[in-house]
Amino acid sequence: MSNINEKDLSEFLESNLRSLNDIDDAVATSSAECNYEDYEEFTNSVDLTFFEQDLSGVLKELKKLAESVVISGKKCDIRNIFEESDVATMKFNLFVWYFLENGQRSDSSEEDVDKGVSAASSYIAMCSLPGAISDLYQIGLYNQCLKIIRNCCHTVRIGETVVTKKSSGAKKKKAGGKSDETNVDGEMTVTTGAADPIIGPPRIAVDSAERYLHHLTTQLFAFLHSNTFSIDTPTLMSTLEVVEDIGRLDLDNRTAGRAIRANSVHEFRSLERFTDRYCAFVHSLVESKYKTRAEVAYGRLIRPRLALMPYPDESNKSSKISTERKRSGELHVNLILSRISRNPEARELKYIQTVTVMVYSQCPDLAEFRTNIATFIHKILEALPYTYTYDFVQFMNVLFKGRGAGVKSLSTELSSILISSFDFTAPDPGAIPNLDAEQNEEEDEEEEGEDEEEEEENEQDDVAVKEEEQSDKSDEENDGDNEENVSKKKEEKKKEKKAKEVKEVGRMDAMSVLYNIVYMACLDKAAAMRLHGANSLTKILQSQSHREAFQLFCATINAEMDEKFGAVGDNLSESLEDLNVSGKAPSSKTKKPTDLLLDEQQIIQKFNKLKLMNKGETRVEKDIVYMIVRRLSTDDKAPVKKAACSLLKSYLSYCDEASKFEVVLSILQMLCRDRMVSVRKTGADAFTELMLRDAILFKESLSSKWLHTLISMLNDTDNDVTEHARKLIMKVLTPLLENSSDLTWTLLDTIESVTNHRQYLMSTLKDAVREKLVKRTVMDSMKQHIISGSEKLDGAWMVFSQLCVQFEQNVDFAIETFSRVDLSRESNLVQYMIHVIENNIKKIDDDTKSDLVNTLQGTFRDYCLHPSHSRSIYHCLGKLMDGIGDRSLHGKEFSDFGETLLIKCFDTIVQSFEMFKDKDEWKRNSESQERLLCTALNVASEVFSYSPQLVPRHERLGKTLSLIVNSTENGSSDASTVNPDMPSVHHTRPPTQLSEVPSSQKSSKGGMMSHEGAMFSDKVRAVGVVTLANMILAHDRLLKLMPMLVKQLQYNTAHQIRSNIVLAIGDICSSYKTDRYAPMLAASLCDPSVIVRRHAINQIARLISFGIFRFNGEIMIRMMLASLDANEDVRNDAKLYISEVLQSEEPNFFPLNFVQYMIALTQARRLVGVGHDEDDRGQVDVAIGGGDPLARPSRIAIYTFMIDSLDDRSRFDVKMSICQRIFTPIVNGEYDFSDYNVQCLLDDALLIMASNEMQVKMDVGKNPNENAMDDPSPEVLEAATGFMQKVYLDHYMKTIVPSILSLREFLNQHRSPLQRKCLLAIRMICIEHKNDIDEILQDNRQLKDEMMFELQRVKQRTEEANRILDEYLKRVAEFKKQQKRLSKSPAPMELDAEPVQESAEAVEMGSPARRIEEDQENVEEEVEMRTPQKKNPDADVPRTPLNALRSTTEEKSTPNARLLSPKTIKKIRRSLGALIHTEMRLNPPNLEETKIDDTTINRSKQADKTEEKTIVEEEPMEEAAAEKTVTAENDHVDAEKTVIAVEIPPATEAEEDEVVDVQSESRRSRRRKTPNYDDEESVDADGKIWKKPKIVNKSPEKEVNISANVTLRRSRRGQSTEPPVVKENSNRKRKSVDEEEENVPTSSSGNTENDPLSRGVTPLIFDESKLGAGRHCSTPIRSREDADPSDVTFSLNLSAITEKEDLKNRSKKVKLITFTISSKRMKRKADQCHCINLPSKFVLFISTVCIIVRLSAVFSLN
């Protein structure tokens, strides 16, 4: 058969193609040399008469014969065939070339394409025969055959091709006036000129293209499968591109799962689908004897498809993966699995592993790619042998550390899959061995040669680069582009060299590698990595074995980190390298100009780290999983929080420690209250799934918190959350209700105990019945439980009543039970029975209804019911009588019955009046009569609610109730003020818009208001308020009684009455749509009672939401002051409304009203007649605390609360507003600059302008979508930051800079101490725009130099602080490492004295003088600075039973384990406090170790639980503590002064006389820094204790010295020029000065104690040290005019004199002298001066002169 086919083929060639020999040999040779590319030259050189004949039959027959030869499988040499046919091979190639060229053009007809396909099939088939490599196979012709195949593939894949013109757009068509035409067959033809060529494949039918492809692919498979000769790499790549196009033709879900292999051409020919043929192509390439084909097949065909890379012709390269690419990836995974199943050689397995690693390392950071690629790799690793899988995990360990976010994310996801699906318990099989030693040696030799060549090339390149640099410098010195190019080349070469250097990484256990990937992902800085880490950790925690192994791994790796870097704390990702121990700035991190302000926080963190390292404390928590869970659940990204919900659920499901369980459960509760809706819903799902699990150890705690959390979500602002919470609640309650247990009744009773929870559950049950989620069996089970008479019946009745209403059943059972209940006792069951009865009236027969009505009427007539039942029972009676509503039938009868009850009520009040007159009788019957009164008033209130028409007929009842409510103990005229902030007719200032209120005082002494003494108890009067309010709501004529109610808010001492009045005012304002009583509700925020303040906040919020009140004026100010309330609930209510409700409705509220708050809090008043009215500026006069400014810390707390919610734009707007509304008016004289309140306002404004909190952070690039994870690139952020800086600078130059410079000139003219703060404000602007200082201060060179010096000084001080900390951190770290090495040594060794001792060098300060002084004191303090040593260290060396049980923590807590003593730590803290710029913050950081006493916390908690909570007077600030921190704590002289300053003699008679003034002042001044319940101390919102310091006299020199620069004071700390503190009792024996100066009379102690003023008079008009102190205590401060200067104590500071001298040595010899002048002598001199009418200032001057004269005499004696 082979010979016949061979012969037939040769005879066919001889008979039909022998004419080809007529072609010139030179043409054939030249065509072969040009690789058959110059077709035009060929056509011009050859006579085409033979080619132009109809040769289609010849070509088809040739294709048939060639194909039959190939399919036969017999080997025949093609050279013999051509020799027998006498046809030249080169000329046959010309024959094929002609038809290939005509069949592949875009304008080729289908006949030409058919001829070209036949020629290509014949040529490829003949090339597959042996001997074709000699002359037949030509690369040019083969590539043209491939092009014909690709054209057919393109036609099949996208359908019949539409012809398009090259580079001819629609605009050109219109401009040329030409259009396309359509022929009769519907085909589009192009009528444009010949100049526009047509591109694309030729137009043929799809069926024809598929038929052609079947022939062409069969011949191509035969060519590749024959392996007769190798193909060069470019041709092979072209072949693979064609094969890849074949694999895309009919790819679908069915074909993607198959990987068919063909063993022969005959089998390949039987494959119908192109996808199956593609798989056969891949198998053939991989199994080829030429290794290059297998390598290229894996690299070019398989790897891109596994990596889901786009195809070359795909224009859409977006992040979304097409369906075709996903199916292709699945197909190639099946191909690899098929190859692995055939037990391939090690070389092919190595190829598969390499491809897998490449796909893994090139994964982009996109979720869709990551998920699919992880699935592909997992399937491949499952099929690979264990050795290759283990080795791949080692690759993950190497690549995870240095790759991008995509590889890290894929590693995290892949790790979770491998952990759960693989068993790596087997030992490490080792690295995969080399495949061929000889080949490796050859490759090594080749690589060495290549390395040598590369080194030579690199040397040549370096020489060339140097020559280029020299030429650039000589020829083009100013050419910056060439320099950039040279630097780029260097950087590229450095990167290449670094890439070649591969660091060896040791092999680890596979599970440890996977655990480490998850562990590091949870702690990663990128939010996307933390998200993947959380998801992976969730899967780990679900398995007990993996959970324990992961916990063990975390403990091990942390121990290694501690050993390497030192135990730093609980921050898992920090080391000493992060601490920058060397003191040099890291090169990788570039600082922004504004990063100077962030160094302060870093210094504080370093100092805290130093203290922890020095103490040697072990980690607070060893449960690393617990720490990671807490960290991820408090993340700032919403997707991470949602992933953390599942993580919390997994952790709580196995947690067995109660404390950790409670903490994690509280975090889950916080997630259910998150501001993101999706987070709240996810948290609720996790909470509910936990609740449905049975294996929870702390089920009771879980149930309670789940109940409160989910029911609270029923009141969510988002409807989706509410609906979701309702479904989750029923998901838990439905099985519990159907199968009742103790947990069921406990949950129901817990819900029933809270009113809001009860209402939410009732509505939820109603919806559940409507949706058929609850069955009737639940109602029956509740009924059986009620009949059984168990203890827990409230919850059962709650569910039973609602189900009875919904199913309309069991009304008879409810009536029967109701008839047996004692209504005179309080019971929650009554309301549920009434609920069933009133909603099922149609089910009640007439007789039963009549009997029930009579029973209820008799109950009301006799008042035989508890007051709590009056509302529900009266409403039920109205329903039974059909007397409620406009369409009621018996409304008249119901109204008449109500009037009867009102008459009965009035008679009861009269009876009580008569009984009240007889004190004995009232004492006996007061309890029963008041209970009767409360019931009668409650019933009357319900009557007025349902029958408002009865109010005008019973107006006397309202007046009587007003008389009862307004009665006081001692008469209204003498009553003490409970709330002095309540507005009244006695205005202390002109009336404002909202403060004009009706008069609340009686107009005459007679009438009803003349009754003396409180009538009845507070409870009766509180109920009377409710009844009176209902009457006012029903009848507007009774509004005249409102002033009396308002007056009770001011004078009534019963908080129940005031609380009901607040609620009544809110209802009246809501009903009558009036804001007349807005000031009263605002003033109620200052009420002593907590319940009154909370009701006031709720009523104000409700009325503002209704649009009746506006959030401005007094409401705006007092609501903000409520955020500083002493009670936590009041604070939370106020902050919740301001931050959540108000800011959501008005986002720009704080920026618009920031200055208004400042003016109101400081009580600064503009001068009258300055040209602008305050109302024009939006300012409202609100008097707070009698016109005194609020305490400074309280003001700062409010400013900080507002600033925290501001963004960059809002901060800048606030700064502009401060300049326009504060700085400019003060400079223009619109404010009285000498006024103390104005000084406070200006001080606050400058502090805010100079504070770090108000810095424009340049926060750009934030994604408004909070679910987004990807952040913008650094380049984009840098460009945006630069642009915004220019914009802000432009506005700074226009508004802020001119205003603040004019203010500086104004302060300089007045020589104000605020000049320093003004410079700080200017310095903040210069820090924000560090590179634009020349432009900002271009007109003031001196100020510019000052600012440059300030910035340099801040930088130097920060560097000094960092240097000090870095040095000590390094020393402590080395000491700890040495201790660990010694502890691990086998023999006990004594520690050397040198490392244990501290260095004698003291901590360097910011002042050179301080350093010199401390160097002198080093020798004296050397012994004190050493660490305490044990008395007998030799006795502690051996381990005894006593010390053998000592824990590691105890050993580390001993003094021997600390390098630095507490005294050294104290010095370091003081040094840092002097160096860091705390003056640039609203809340300066505190380096002191503050600790809150537990007894104080318990006392504050007990105070919160009291029923009546009264706010006491204002407490002082922490100014004294701040001054102690600033002053020299280390000086013994200062310690003595502090002790002396605190000692104050007992109060004199004159001070006792001032108590009355104190009380009167306290009534007027109620607002304070932090309200408290103790007169001696207070606990603020942060839990810090504030003590009342006693008043200490300060001399003017002392106050000036306190306000001086910190560095200056530090430099003079050890000198004798320190100003002394005034000594109250100077009776003690004096030292040398007293002994030498005997002529100076001493003052008597008795006169000093009896003097009414002990504080002295300051000669300064305004002192900065007292600025912003506010009202610290209730003691009235007398003015200088009223002060009696009979006894004045002077403290002279001679440092001002010695500072100006250059003789520094003399300053230490100067001694401080304190002179106390006798009060009698001073008084005598004052009397003499007053006799001649001398002014007091002159008297003071004379006294000062006298003292100076005596001082000179003393110095002369010395």
Swiss-Prot record:
Changing residue 1024 to E: In mr17; chromosome segregation and orientation defects with increased anaphase bridges and chromosome lagging which have sister chromatids with a single kinetochore connected to microtubules emanating from both spindle poles. It comes from Caenorhabditis elegans. GO terms for molecular function: histone binding. GO terms for cellular component: condensed chromosome; condensed chromosome, centromeric region; condensin complex; nucleoplasm. It is found in: Nucleus; Chromosome, Centromere. Its main location: nucleus. Residues 438-462, 474-484, 1414-1423 have a biased composition (Acidic residues). Keywords: Cell cycle, Cell division, Centromere, Chromosome, Coiled coil, DNA condensation, Mitosis, Nucleus. Disulfide bonds: none annotated. It comes from the Eukaryota. This is Condensin-2 complex subunit hcp-6. Component of the condensin-2 complex. Residues 428-501, 969-1008, 1379-1460, 1500-1656 are annotated as: Disordered. Residues 969-979, 1602-1618, 1640-1651 have a biased composition (Polar residues). Residues 463-473, 485-501, 1424-1437, 1500-1512 have a biased composition (Basic and acidic residues). Disruption phenotype: RNAi-mediated knockdown results in temperature sensitive embryonic lethality with chromosomes displaying segregation defects with increased anaphase bridges and chromosome lagging. Chromosomal protein which is recruited to mitotic chromosomes by hcp-3 (CENP-A) and hcp-4 (CENP-C). Involved in chromosome segregation during mitosis, playing a role in chromosome condensation and in maintaining chromosome morphology, rigidity and orientation during mitosis. SUPFAM superfamilies: ARM repeat. Residues 1326-1385 form a coiled coil. The gene is hcp-6. One of its GO terms (biological process) is mitotic sister chromatid segregation. Residues 999-1008 have a biased composition (Low complexity).
